[in-house]
């Protein structure tokens, strides 16, 4: 792996974590860091395959339209590179965290795509989130209900409004009742210091909270 900056963390949920940092790569290893030896070619191949599929659709366009050039965007549940590729084309800096119960380490290439098994609130354990001002939650896949609930719980929202002044949700699979509950939670913890915009386009329903 060459000489990389190495930092160690302890998580109540995940145990020992080691973050390796290179110029354009991050690797977050669970457990003994000596066992870490990722097959980079596998991930690079998979990322490029997903990128070619993504170019044929506008799935991420609705969310990308909510991001501005001066934003630094932290994305949760973004799939393998879809939204990061779209933002990269626009010159917008982003870091994407994929919540995955199978992959037990974090991997990024030049798109800063990441994979990590974690519960939602644990993201606030990592210092690098302070580099980002816009949080995007794109984890609302109906087959991933075990993941979704973390990001609409009060504990997560209470922390999120402390760290980010823009929070965007893909709420395509949320009911109107669920959407209203989400709005109420954000207003509660932002102490009404937020404006809300919603839009229906690109086969998505997107909601953005802007916290003053």
Language model: regions and residue ranges:
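C-terminal lobe and adjacent flexible extensions of AdoMet/dcAdoMet transferase-like proteins
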Residues: 209-212
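Detector for methionine-enriched segments
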Residues: 1-4, 30, 48, 85, ...
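The AdoMet/dcAdoMet-binding core of the Class I SAM-like
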Residues: 9, 53-189, 193-207
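Short, flexible, mixed-charge acidic loops at enzyme active sites
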Residues: 38-43, 132
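N-terminal auxiliary segments of SAM/dcSAM-dependent transferases
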Residues: 1-37
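A short, flexible beta-alpha/helix-coil linker loop
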Residues: 35, 45, 140-144
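Segments forming oxygen-rich coordination pockets for charged ligands
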Residues: 31, 43-54
């Amino acid at each position: 792996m060459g000489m990389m900056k190495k930092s160690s963390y302890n998580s109540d949920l995940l145990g020992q974590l080691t973050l390796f940092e290179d110029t354009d790569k991050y690797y977050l290893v669970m457990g003994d860091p000596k066992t870490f030896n990722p097959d980079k070619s596998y991930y690079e191949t998979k990322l490029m395959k997903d990128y070619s599929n993504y170019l044929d659709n506008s799935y991420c366009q609705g969310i990308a339209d909510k991001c501005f050039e001066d934003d630094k965007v932290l994305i949760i549940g973004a799939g393998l590179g879809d939204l990061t590729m779209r933002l990269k084309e626009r010159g917008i800096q982003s870091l994407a965290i994929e919540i995955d119960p199978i992959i037990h380490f974090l991997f990024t290439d030049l798109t800063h795509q990441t994979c990590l098994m974690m519960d939602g609130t644990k993201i606030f354990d990592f210092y690098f989130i302070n580099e980002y001002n816009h949080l995007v939650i794109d984890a609302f896949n109906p087959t991933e209900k075990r993941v979704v609930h973390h990001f609409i719980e009060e504990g997560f929202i209470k922390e999120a409004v402390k760290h980010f002044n823009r929070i965007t949700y893909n709420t395509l699979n949320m009911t109107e009742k669920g959407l209203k509950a989400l709005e109420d939670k954000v207003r509660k913890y932002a102490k009404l210091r937020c404006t809300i915009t919603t839009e229906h386009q690109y086969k998505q329903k997107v909601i953005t909270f802007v916290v003053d």
